[in-house]
């Protein structure tokens, strides 16, 4: 008699109901980590933001789009059917990430439904982030 495998049962049920949905992604940050950053995984969030900000300061809309597109391609390869991605809007990246996410949303259309949620990473208590 085969041993019961709850993971296999879960996957079977999810697929029978239309497949997986990634409901909390950060596709604008996909593929931005480097091996050098891996030893910083236990650092305080504010320290990690410095590394993230370095990418964001230098990333154009096209850079964000390529990362988002690659992440979605990977999700589709894994049979994920749709996703919600949280995208930064702040004084560092301004509208670059959200613009790229909207382009990706249009690019994939119904092939991969993408919900975009805005994330004001630097907070809304200061005037500049709030205005964005």
Locate the predicted segments by residue.
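Active-site loop-helix segments enriched in His/Asp/Glu that coordinate
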Residues: 37, 55-132
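Single, functionally critical "micro-switch" positions that shape active/binding sites
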Residues: 21-25, 51-55, 78
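A near-ubiquitous, low-amplitude feature marking generic local secondary-structure context
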Residues: 10, 15, 47, 51-54, ...
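Di-metal (Zn2+ and/or Mg2+/Mn2+) metal-binding site signature of metallo-dependent hydrolases
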Residues: 13-36
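Histidine (H) residue identity feature
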Residues: 17, 24-26, 42-44, 107-110
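Active-site gating loops and adjacent loop-to-helix segments of metal-dependent hydrolytic enzymes
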Residues: 30-64
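Histidine-rich, glycine-flanked metal-binding segment
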Residues: 1-17, 117
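Mixed-charge, polar/low-complexity N-terminal
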Residues: 2, 6-8, 50, 62, ...
């Amino acid at each position: 008699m085969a041993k019961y495998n709850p993971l296999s049962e879960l996957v079977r049920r999810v697929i029978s109901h239309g497949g997986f949905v990634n409901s909390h992604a950060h596709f604008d940050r996909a593929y931005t980590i480097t091996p050098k950053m891996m030893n910083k995984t236990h650092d305080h969030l504010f320290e990690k933001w410095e590394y993230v900000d370095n990418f964001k300061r230098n990333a154009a809309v096209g850079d964000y789009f390529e990362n988002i597109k690659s992440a979605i391609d990977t999700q589709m390869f894994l049979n994920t059917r749709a996703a919600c991605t949280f995208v930064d809007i702040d004084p560092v990246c301004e509208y670059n990430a959200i613009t790229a996410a909207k382009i990706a949303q249009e690019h994939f259309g119904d092939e991969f439904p993408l919900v975009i949620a805005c994330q004001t990473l630097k907070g809304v208590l200061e005037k500049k982030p709030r205005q964005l």
